[in-house]
């Protein structure tokens, strides 16, 4: 829900001023996957520095729902967030998000994963992927 996204991100930004905040969002619930909140979601990401969103077509394994009438248009949501002066990206798969985050995350960044499900296991795979990147980039 846009209010939950907005208050979560605003609270984190307030608690950690000066830190770069990366919001990673999976619109998985029936409510969040609908276009009903299309115009409310962009404002919800104002407190973050980077918004990363899983396309509805892959969110929660509901293949094809992005094509349904009334589904949240994630590419358009991404453009709306960018028009508000934020960096934003959308991806079709969790693996693409993981790869993007491994390139983007820097020391000191705060990364929050938002989903009402397991986000394709991202909370488990991302730390391991970041550790591999760190090991590969450490001078020997």
Where are these regions (language model features)?
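ATP-dependent carboxylate-amine ligase
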Residues: 1-140
